[in-house]
C-alpha cells in the first residue's frame, strides 16, 4: 500500500531516537545487530526503520515510521525499558506527525 492508497484512515508517526554509542560501526554493526533488525522488522505497526550512526560524535539510533501513534507508543515503552536494563543512558526520543501530502511530492516511498 502506498501513501496514495491509504486515505485518511491512519495517521503515520515518526519516532526519532539516538543515544551515545561506541561502536561497532558500518558493516561490523550490521553483522552484530542483524538478528535485532529482524526482530524489529516484526514489530506490529512498524512500517520501516532507518538505522543511523555517527562514529565522529559517538552516536547511533534510528528513524522509525509507524502506522499510528498507538503502535509507536507500544514499541517505545518496551524499547526504553530494554535500553535501561542494558545500562544505556542519554537516550533522546522525539515523536513527529507525517505530512503525507508533502512527503508524496518529495518522492516519499512509504509502503506497508
Residue ranges and their predicted role:
Residues 1-59, 69-77, 90-112:
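Short S/T/G/P-rich N-terminal loop/turn motif that feeds into the first structured element of a domain
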Residues 61-64:
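A short, exposed loop/beta-hairpin motif centered on an aromatic-Gly-Thr core
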Amino acid at each position: 500500500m502506498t501513501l496514495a492508497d491509504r486515505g485518511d484512515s491512519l495517521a503515520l508517526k515518526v519516532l526519532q531516537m539516538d543515544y551515545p554509542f561506541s561502536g561497532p560501526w558500518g558493516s561490523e554493526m550490521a553483522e552484530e545487530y542483524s538478528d535485532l533488525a529482524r526482530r524489529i522488522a516484526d514489530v506490529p505497526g512498524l512500517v520501516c526503520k532507518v538505522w543511523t550512526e555517527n562514529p565522529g560524535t559517538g552516536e547511533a539510533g534510528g528513524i522509525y515510521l509507524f502506522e499510528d501513534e498507538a503502535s509507536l507508543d507500544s514499541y517505545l515503552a518496551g524499547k526504553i525499558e530494554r535500553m535501561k536494563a542494558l545500562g544505556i543512558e542519554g537516550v533522546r526520543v522525539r515523536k513527529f506527525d507525517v505530512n503525507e501530502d508533502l512527503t508524496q511530492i518529495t518522492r516519499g516511498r512509504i509502503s506497508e
